[in-house]
From Swiss-Prot:
This is Proteasome assembly chaperone 2. The keyword Nucleus applies. GO terms for biological process: chaperone-mediated protein complex assembly. InterPro entries: Proteasome_assmbl_chaperone_2, Proteasome_assmbl_chp_2_euk, PSMG2_sf. One of its GO terms (cellular component) is nucleus. It comes from Xenopus tropicalis. PANTHER family: PROTEASOME ASSEMBLY CHAPERONE 2. Belongs to the PSMG2 family. Keywords: Chaperone, Nucleus. Forms a heterodimer with psmg1. Chaperone protein which promotes assembly of the 20S proteasome as part of a heterodimer with psmg1. It is found in: Nucleus.
Amino acid sequence: MFVPIGSEQDFPSDYTLLLPAISVGNVGQLAIDLIISTLKIPKVGYFYTDCLVPMVGSNPYETDEENAKELCTNAEVYALPSQKLAVLQLRSLVIKKKSKSFRQALVSWIKRCAFARVILLSSCHAYHRDDTQLFGTPFRYLVTPALQKSVADVLKELEWKEMEKVSSYPGLNDNEKRVFIPGGGFTKRFYDDCCLEDLQMAVVLKFCSEGDNVPDAFSLLNQVNEWLHLVASTNGDVLAKWKAPGSWQLLFGSGLPAAIF
């Protein structure tokens, strides 16, 4: 599944893997773009899979003509040895009938690389919140039992809120509860897979709605940065530290031509 660009096939076992869910507003994918662009993480390989919608484009992180000619595909892997960080960026949808196959291949690769921890950036429909979720922070997290012990104190100190469980049958049986992440794509099932495989994995997500989700990506990344310290903040202001890719200038298309006025 993973095809390296160079001779390196795997990663050292102390690396952290960051990846996005393909979820509402593409918040996780936008946040991953910011990480790659800000830290200038070089590409080390890509995923060869038939589980994603085929896609190819120009390099989204380069603005000069020469480097922008480099092609990007639907699933690429980046690595930054100085921070022991690996990043997987997904740029197209998972084919519905192949979602399970994709998750299995992803889990298999994670196990082979023996990543120290895996962090999935995701989002969830804001309109599905219950009354208790309408107040306070819009961020939630989930951690697998394998990771719980090592991060429990840190997350408690950060005052993060765990994703609440909701009734499986509202109004009929409130005793049976489950984790429900509407609009989260493969988030819930991938989390369940990691629990079954005893992987050290965490989900960090934000409640949001479809629209201009760039601010959601910035805020989600700031939340993650409190834990991982990817970039240093100055006087508590970390927003200015994130660098948006040049390709974001065309996020909503080119400007209106003056001739129409």
